[in-house]
Amino acid sequence: MKIAPPNRASHSYVQKLVGSPAEVFPLLCPVREAEWLDGWDPVAVWSRSGVAEPDCVFLTPASGGASQDAIWYVTRHEPGNGFVEMLKITPGATACRLTIQLTAAAPGCEAEITYTHTSLGPAGDRFVAGFTAEHYGEFMREWEARMNHFLATGTCLRGEVGG
């Protein structure tokens, strides 16, 4: 058995969103995300309700040099608390824990989003090395702009986000 210290990177970011936690929370879902995130298209979703719920599983296409689709598992889904936790396994690359905590903050809410990526091998080492605070900040600002556009207009912001 090999036991080794993890090669891991974790970053958090607080988004300022124009919707209330009750408006935002349902959009944190593999199905509903396609409404506001241009290009989001899961390969498959397993859900009794048809949307995010505890034990929902979904696949996203291989990306970033990965050879297999990523497997996502919703471990906690607490609408009343504005909290969701998901695990994402990209075989041969990374294991990721994603947490999102929504908190009411006028005029909408704040979303504290944390991604923690742990390498599972050489491909994961490369991913973790590139998962910098700068990269994460850019990713979060784009997500924030797209979510706010959807919350304000009800439409998906297509193409690149200016900044």
Q: Where on the chain are the PLM-derived regions?
A:
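Hydrophobic ligand-binding cavity/cleft-lining segments
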Residues: 1-51
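Short, surface-exposed coil-to-beta transition loops
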Residues: 10-12, 67-72, 94-99
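A short, structured loop/turn motif at beta-sheet edges
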Residues: 18-22, 75-81, 101-110
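Beta-strand/loop substructures that line and gate deep hydrophobic ligand-binding cavities in soluble
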Residues: 87-141, 158-160
